[in-house]
Amino acid sequence: MKQMSPTAYVILGMVKKEPRTGYEIKALVDNSTRFFWAASYGQIYPELKRLAEAGLVVGSDSSTGGRRRTVYEITADGEEELQAWLRQPPQTFEMRDEGLLKLFFADALPREEALEIVRKMRAQRLAMHDRLRAIEATKGDVEESFPMVVLRGGLEFTEWFADWCGRMEEEILAAAPEKRST
């Protein structure tokens, strides 16, 4: 198989834990890696097909309530591929945040509109923090330590970012008043 996408490795990691359908993989992604690596159905199903063709997963038909579905399981080659990828150094971190991009160019807006960008970013981070707290509450005594490490990192990051937005709002408000043309 040629160069694999990070989404392919998300799928391998999810089916390493236990066999799953594409639908189950998507549901799991939505409550775990989505906060730092999202995957849509439009990515998951084509990747499952490529992984199966490469012999990294194997699908078996299963019926539930008259509905046909395919359950995917990782193969020995798939486990080797996943472990090889995990051992590689991570790609250089590249943050992409449209809110920060807009804030970077916010001098082009009246101050109140620029402040609204900061307020919306803060509200988004607080909402994400609440969602992560809800996920944390459902985990109980999770045996997997590294997903919990990442969850705690997400909680700390969203809390820090929301606090930063609050401080930036205060600084912008405290700055010299906006000059108005007469």
Question: Which positions does each model-derived feature cover?
Answer:
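Long amphipathic alpha-helical coiled-coil segments
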Residues: L173-T182
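Amphipathic alpha-helical dimerization/coiled-coil segments
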Residues: Q83-R131
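Amphipathic alpha-helical coiled-coil segments
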Residues: T158-E171
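Acidic interhelical loop/turn segments
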Residues: R133-L151
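Residue-level recognition of alpha-helical structural elements
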Residues: S40, P110, A114, E143-P147
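Basic helix-turn-helix/winged-helix DNA-binding cores
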Residues: M1-E94
